């Protein structure tokens, strides 16, 4: 299959990223009651300009991976922070799962890359997931990267440009 990101059509609309992440987390919390979701998501809206469906797909994929790699009862923490100038938002999704070996950490965003084939089979493939996520985030002028400690879990970080819309405009 040919997938050239340049041919993709991106919608442009203002999306409340906090509301989106609340909804995604709440949906997974319903379908995976055995997982422990912790949300640090501000109540006031933070707006990102972009494609709602594609960004939802990205965060769905990241949270779904966190669920797959986290033992039951461990925490999955979704955190949203704005930088000092309120022009970038940083989202982190942290699991307390098996972690990713350091030698693999930068390769997980490559197409069809798999950390461990034997483990992957039981987990279901995430080959295209993070590569596609990277394409989508970069098309939104953002960045995505990972940190991990084997045996302690992983954190996926996403930063995106955002707009702080004053309350009086809402």
Which positions does each model-derived feature cover?
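A conserved beta-strand-to-alpha-helix junction within the catalytic ATP-binding
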Residues: 11-26
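Short helix-loop "hinge" at the ATP-lid/N-box region of the Bergerat-fold HATPase_c
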Residues: 66-67
């Amino acid at each position: 299959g040919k997938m050239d990101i340049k041919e993709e059509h991106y919608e442009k609309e203002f999306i409340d990223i906090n509301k989106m992440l609340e909804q995604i987390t709440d949906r997974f919390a319903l379908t995976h009651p055995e997982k422990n979701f912790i949300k640090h998501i501000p109540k006031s809206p933070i707006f990102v300009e972009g494609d709602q469906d594609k960004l939802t797909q990205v965060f769905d994929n990241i949270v779904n991976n966190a669920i797959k790699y986290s033992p039951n009862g461990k925490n999955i923490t979704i955190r949203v922070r704005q930088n000092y100038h309120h022009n970038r938002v940083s989202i982190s999704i942290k699991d307390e799962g098996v972690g990713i070996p350091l030698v693999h950490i930068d390769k997980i965003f490559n197409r069809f890359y798999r950390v461990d084939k034997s483990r992957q089979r039981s987990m279901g493939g995430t080959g295209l997931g993070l590569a596609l996520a990277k394409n989508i985030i970069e098309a939104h002028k953002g960045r995505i990267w990972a940190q991990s400690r084997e045996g302690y879990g992983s954190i996926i970080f996403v930063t995106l440009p955002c707009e702080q819309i004053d309350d009086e405009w809402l």
